[in-house]
C-alpha cells in the first residue's frame, strides 16, 4: 500500500508532467503557426521550437524511466535509453545557450567598437562554431555510451551495476556541457552589465522608450536565470536518481529525485510563455474563457 508521502510525490509528478506537456505543446504550436503565417523561419522561432521539442522528449523520457526502470535494470536497453537521454539533455542546454546569445545580440546596448564588430560579424560565426562543438560532443557521447563494458552479473545482489553507471552518466551528461554553460554565463553577464548601464542612463535621460528596453532586459534575465537554476537542480538530481534504483529500489527516493528532474523541462516552459507577449495573452484568454464556461455550466 502506498504511503501518503509517496502518493503526494506521484501527484506532483503528474502535475509537472501535465504542465510541461501543455506548456511545451503551446510553444511548439506557436512556433509552427508563426512559420505558417510568415512562410519563413526566424532565429527566435527555431530556437523556441528546438527548445520546446527537446523538453517535450525529455519529459517523456523521465516518465518512461520512472514507469519502466525495473524492467530495464537487467536489459541492454537501459544503455541506449541512457545515451538518448543524455543527447536530448545536452541538446536542450545548447538551445538554451543559443537563446541566451540571441537575447544578448538583440537586447544589449554597448558602444564599444569591439562589441559592435562582434555583434555585426562574429555572431553567425559563433553560432556555427557552437553547432560544430555540439555535433562533436554528441558523437563522443554516443561513442562512450555504446562502447561501455558491463561487468558480468553473477550472483550479485545488485542486478545492475549502478555504481559504475553513476559515474558514466555524470561524465556523459557533463562532457558536452562546459562550453555551452560558459557561453550561457557570459551572455547572461553581458545582459546584466547592459541593464546596469541602461539603468544609469535612465537617471540622466527621460523615460519612455528606454523603459521598454529595461523591461526586455529583465524579462530575458528572468528566463535565463530560471533556466540556470532548474538546470543545476536537474544536474544534481541525476546521479542520485540512478543510485536510488538499486535492487530493491527505494520508491520514495526514486520519486523525489525524478520529480526534481521533471521540474526542469516543465517549469521553464512557463517562463518562456510569460516572456512572449502574444502567447501569454492567448493563454490568458483561453484560461478566462475556461473559467467563464465553468461558471456558466457549473452548479
Curated annotation (Swiss-Prot):
Residues in the Extracellular compartment per record: 1, 67-82, 149-175, 245-253
CDD domains per record: 7tm_TAS2R
GO cellular component annotations of the record: plasma membrane
Record keywords, A-Z: G-protein coupled receptor, Glycoprotein, Membrane, Receptor, Sensory transduction, Taste, Transducer, Transmembrane, Transmembrane helix
Transmembrane segment boundaries: 2-22, 46-66, 83-103, 128-148, 176-196, 224-244, 254-274
Membrane side Cytoplasmic: residue ranges: 23-45, 104-127, 197-223, 275-299
A Pfam entry, by short name: TAS2R
Database matches in SUPFAM superfamilies: Family A G protein-coupled receptor-like
Matches recorded under Gene3D superfamilies: Rhodopsin 7-helix transmembrane proteins
Membrane topology: Multi-pass membrane protein
Other comments on record: Most taste cells may be activated by a limited number of bitter compounds; individual taste cells can discriminate among bitter stimuli.
Protein name: Taste receptor type 2 member 5
Taxonomic source organism: Papio hamadryas
Gene: TAS2R5
Amino acid at each position: 500500500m502506498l504511503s501518503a508521502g509517496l502518493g503526494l510525490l506521484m501527484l506532483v509528478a503528474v502535475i509537472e508532467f501535465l504542465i510541461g506537456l501543455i506548456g511545451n505543446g503551446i510553444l511548439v504550436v506557436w512556433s509552427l503557426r508563426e512559420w505558417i503565417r510568415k512562410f519563413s523561419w526566424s532565429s527566435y522561432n527555431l530556437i523556441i521550437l528546438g527548445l520546446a521539442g527537446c523538453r517535450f522528449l525529455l519529459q517523456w523520457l523521465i516518465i518512461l524511466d520512472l514507469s519502466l526502470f525495473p524492467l530495464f535494470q537487467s536489459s541492454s536497453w537501459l544503455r541506449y535509453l541512457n545515451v538518448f537521454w543524455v543527447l536530448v539533455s545536452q541538446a536542450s542546454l545548447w538551445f538554451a545557450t543559443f537563446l541566451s546569445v540571441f537575447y544578448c545580440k538583440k537586447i544589449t546596448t554597448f558602444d564599444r567598437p569591439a562589441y559592435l564588430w562582434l555583434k555585426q560579424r562574429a555572431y553567425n560565426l559563433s553560432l556555427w562554431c557552437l553547432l560544430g562543438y555540439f555535433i562533436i560532443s554528441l558523437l563522443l557521447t554516443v561513442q562512450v555510451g555504446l562502447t561501455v563494458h558491463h561487468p558480468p552479473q553473477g550472483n550479485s545482489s545488485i542486478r545492475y551495476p549502478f555504481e559504475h553507471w553513476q559515474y558514466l552518466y555524470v561524465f556523459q551528461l557533463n562532457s558536452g556541457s562546459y562550453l555551452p554553460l560558459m557561453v550561457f554565463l557570459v551572455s547572461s553577464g553581458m545582459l546584466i552589465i547592459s541593464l546596469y548601464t541602461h539603468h544609469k542612463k535612465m537617471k540622466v535621460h527621460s523615460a519612455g522608450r528606454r523603459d521598454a528596453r529595461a523591461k526586455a532586459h529583465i524579462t530575458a534575465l528572468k528566463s535565463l536565470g530560471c533556466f540556470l537554476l532548474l538546470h543545476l537542480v536537474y544536474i544534481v538530481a541525476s546521479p542520485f536518481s540512478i543510485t536510488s534504483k538499486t535492487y530493491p529500489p527505494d520508491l520514495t527516493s526514486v520519486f523525489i529525485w525524478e520529480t526534481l528532474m521533471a521540474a526542469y523541462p516543465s517549469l521553464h516552459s512557463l517562463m518562456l510563455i510569460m516572456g512572449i507577449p502574444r502567447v501569454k495573452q492567448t493563454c490568458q484568454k483561453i484560461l478566462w474563457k475556461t473559467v467563464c464556461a465553468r461558471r456558466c455550466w457549473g452548479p
